[in-house]
Design a protein with these regions (language model features):
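A glycosyltransferase accessory/donor-loop signature
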Residues: 1-14, 18-21, 147-275
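Short aromatic/hydrophobic "clamp" motif used to bind/position activated sugar donors
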Residues: 100
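Acidic donor-binding loop of glycosyltransferase active sites
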Residues: 339-352
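Short hydrophobic beta-strand element within catalytic cores of glycosyltransferases
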Residues: 366-370
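Conserved active-site histidine-acidic residue motif and adjacent donor-binding/catalytic loop
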Residues: 307-310, 323-337, 353
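Conserved catalytic-core segment of nucleotide-activated headgroup transferases in glycan assembly
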Residues: 37, 271-316
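Conserved donor-nucleotide/metal-binding helix-loop-beta segment in metal-dependent transferases, i.e.
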Residues: 107-136
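Active-site-proximal specificity loops/subdomain of glycosyltransferases
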Residues: 45-48, 52-93
């Protein structure tokens, strides 16, 4: 018997590229799937294209049109969260299988999800991961749903009624789901809903557990969740695993069909990337000859860090493809950068930031500076001449 694993995703037509990125990531690592796409306005032509692509993976896709009028009047806790988030209430109304994996479309799957489908519900309504901020509740971005129990207990209607009563008092549908399923959900490892995206907030709120496992470069979560407003497809560079999202987004379907050992595994394999990396840590817009250096060194990527927002003279550098700006950076971002640093540019005026010169010397990486910008009190940096033309 050909049994496929049920996956439920919800989106509108404006979010279709994010939806497809999530599907690509799932199919990169998994086969034999049945996708239920909850929506109200995605064109049928997209489904025709997806059917053709997915059939080669022994997968299928269903267009599930939801009557949005049933949920449009419910409030959402933030402007980036739309009423489509309530579509997950209808899972048991349409899914034929006894269990289904629900995923938000700001997630990518980075491994095999078979173990999730093998977990015992133990009479619970869902299997989920505790929220990154409040451990006594679950994050609703990933839910393994006990569809059979939802149907038996008329969960869809119960959720709609409870939402009508409580939607302005709790955190959207996640708040309602936690009310209804209090003490009726089973915990699973954050490996299956590894939450990023609120990194700056986590740092300033002094919650080091938010970065749990991020320091271990060998840790590879199976599902990554880009929570909050700092999505990887936005211009902000605050989000961990940003390149991973763009890797799955950039994959073509022919590549996904390849055998495992033949597939690319990183963003650098499918995109043009710079050969070398340098960094500047600053608290001022005064960066000596920065634009000249950026233009003369096209194979070098310039990573500029500050504890505040950037002024216009630095912000304008964002037009260069080999420049990345990190306002209000976190320790995780700086450590990640230093791990791939080739050399450091000590070209900011004013004071040294975060004892960066000593940190770079400890890494045995070269430091280049101008005579009027050097912060190296031990005179180990290489001093550049202002009229120097070879770099």
């Amino acid at each position: 018997m050909d049994t496929k694993k049920a996956i439920v995703l919800g989106a509108d037509n404006n979010y279709r590229d994010k939806l497809e990125t999530t599907i690509k990531s799932i199919c990169y690592h998994n086969r034999d799937l049945k996708f239920y796409i909850f929506n109200e306005d995605i064109p049928k032509e997209w489904f025709y294209l997806m059917e053709k692509r997915l059939e080669k993976l022994n997968c299928e896709i269903l267009n599930i049109e939801i009557d949005a009028e049933k949920v449009k009047h419910f409030s959402t806790p933030d402007e980036h969260i739309k009423y489509m988030t309530y579509f997950r209430y209808f899972i048991a109304e349409f899914v034929k299988e006894d269990r289904a994996l629900y995923l938000d479309c700001d997630m990518v799957v980075h491994g095999n999800i078979d173990p999730l489908f093998q977990k015992d519900f133990e009479e619970n309504y869902i299997i989920a991961v505790p929220d990154g901020w409040y451990k006594n509740i679950f994050n609703a971005g990933m839910m393994m749903v006990n569809v059979h129990k939802w149907k038996t207990d008329n969960i869809c209607q119960n959720l709609l009624e409870l939402t009508a009563e409580k939607h302005q008092e709790v955190y959207g549908d996640q708040g309602v789901l936690n009310l209804l399923f209090e003490n009726k959900w089973k915990k699973v490892s954050p490996h299956y809903n590894f939450m990023v995206g609120l990194d700056t907030l986590g740092y300033w709120a002094q919650k080091p557990e938010w970065f749990l496992n991020s320091w271990d470069e060998n840790y590879k979560p199976a599902i990554i969740h880009f929570e909050g407003k700092d999505k990887p497809w936005n211009d902000s560079l605050k989000t961990r695993y940003r390149e991973l999202w763009w890797f799955y987004n950039g994959l073509d379907w022919q590549t996904i069909l390849l055998e495992k050992d033949s597939k690319p595994t990183s963003f650098s394999e499918i995109a043009t990337v710079n050969l070398f990396h340098t960094a500047i840590f600053t608290d001022t817009q005064e960066l000596e000859h920065i634009e000249y250096l950026v233009e003369k060194l096209p194979n070098v990527h310039f990573h500029i860090f500050a504890h505040s927002y950037f002024g216009p003279r630095v912000q304008v550098l964002n037009r260069f493809l080999n420049v990345s700006l990190y306002p209000n950076y976190t320790p995780y971002q700086s450590q990640e950068m230093l791990s791939k640093l080739d050399f450091y540019l000590d070209i900011n005026h004013n004071r040294e930031i975060d004892n960066i010169i000593s940190k770079v010397h400890d890494l045995s990486k070269p430091i280049f500076a101008f005579e009027n910008t050097s912060h190296d009190t031990n005179n180990r940096s290489q001093i550049l001449q202002k009229n120097q033309t070879k770099w």
